[in-house]
Amino acid sequence: MFNHSRTLGVLAAVALTAGGLTAATTATAAAAPTAVQSCLGGAKSFSSTYTAPYRWPGSGSVTTTSTCNDINVKPYYGDNVRTCFLPSSGGTSCNAWRWISGGVWGLAATDVKDGTKFYVEFQLGYEYGSVAY
């Protein structure tokens, strides 16, 4: 009888622990889509320059916000996109070209710190759409 009670106690503890882990995992997974919706919900319209280099904004730069962790672009046409950063030390540093299909959100840059100055370039030509940063 002692062994049977002890076994039930251990099984109950395991079940409670597993249930707690499941609840915590579900809560974390549910938070991720909310963050993405919040980020993309603040998207702005963009229109690149009409001549090469095809970029947005047409001059200067924009600054990342705490709304998004990444720089997200939804071009009307499919295009190779890259993000160019302007560090406070001067100069410009651009990441590699990334293909983003027309009409869908794609990542132009990931894990970008808040307050980072940047602009976006399009390789194939004039582009317009939405950007969230």
Language-model regions, residue ranges each:
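Post-signal peptide N-terminal regions of Sec-secreted extracellular proteins
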Residues: A30-Y133
